[in-house]
Structures are given as C-alpha cells and as structure tokens.
Design a protein with these regions (language model features):
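Fe(II)/2-oxoglutarate oxygenase catalytic core
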Residues: 1-85, 91, 97-156
Length: 156
C-alpha cells in the first residue's frame, strides 16, 4: 500500500524503466554526504537515462538518519517511515543524516520516463484535482480523460 501506489506513479510520472540496484544499511554514526547521482542530462532521442532517484525505507526503528533533499525552494530533511518512498529528480543533491541509534535500511533505485519534469508537474496537479473531485464523477471522469490524453501524446 505505502510502498508503491501504481495509479499515482503511472499517472504522474509515466515510468518506462525502473532499476532497483541495491540496498543500504546505516547503523549508529553512519551517514551519506550530500551528493548528486552521476547521470548526465537526457538526450531528446534516448530514453535510457534515469530521470528520478528513489529511496524506499524498510525499517523505522532508528533515530536520526533523515533523508535530506536540496531543492530550488530549500533543503528538506525527513525521517521516512517503513515503506515510505522518497522520489526526486536526480539533479537534486541528496543524502542521509547521521543515524544516532538503531538500524536504517533502504532500497535505492532509479526511474526513467518519457515525459519532462514540467509535464509531470501538470499531470501531478491534474491528479490532485481528480482526487479532490472523486465525489463528482463527471469532473473526475473529465480530469482522467485529459490525463490519459496528455500521457499518450507526451509519451510518443
């Protein structure tokens, strides 16, 4: 349930390739310095590049070890719950704060998509409108039709 919301991911990000590479384990005093994943900008004609990184937290019985993400709006630091995912554009610097007790284990991977960040932002906002309109089936249906049309056109 928490680990992967298929409808949300397919609607907003339109993934065409997901790579789950490894898991990390952090114990007391472990951390991961702020860094940017070593992927180059995506050429228009080649979709083998990864657009997003993700980290899925497997345990939550530890202290510290916040997932840190530096965005254009500022830095975010959040302790992820078990099963919670942090999904972010790979161009954003990120890291893990110092674990003060317990064991932090997470799965690391990357995802590519056929659409741009800007297009994904539009689909995200349409998704939010659709979720707010679930009681009004007519509006919900119209929003879903627009989402599906845009996904089809943008994924070409």
């Amino acid at each position: 349930d928490k680990l992967y919301d298929t409808h949300f991911m397919d609607t907003v990000y339109c993934p065409n390739r997901v790579s789950v590479n490894f898991y990390n384990q952090y114990v007391k005093d472990d951390h991961y310095d702020i860094h940017v994943d070593e992927f180059k900008a995506r050429p228009k004609s080649n979709n083998t590049f990864f657009d997003y990184g993700f980290s899925v937290n497997l345990l939550d019985d530890y202290e510290g070890g916040e997932f840190i993400l530096q965005t254009p709006m500022g830095q975010i630091a959040k302790k992820l719950e078990a099963g919670e995912i942090a999904l972010f554009p790979i161009i954003y610097p990120h890291g893990v704060g110092n674990v003060t007790s317990g064991k932090r284990i997470n799965i690391i991977g990357w995802m590519s998509t056929n659409i741009s960040y800007e297009q994904s932002f539009i689909l995200y906002n349409l998704f939010q409108i659709g979720q707010a309109a679930t009681a009004d089936i007519s509006t919900f249906t119209k929003v879903n039709l627009v989402q599906n049309y845009l996904k089809k056109e943008w994924s070409k």
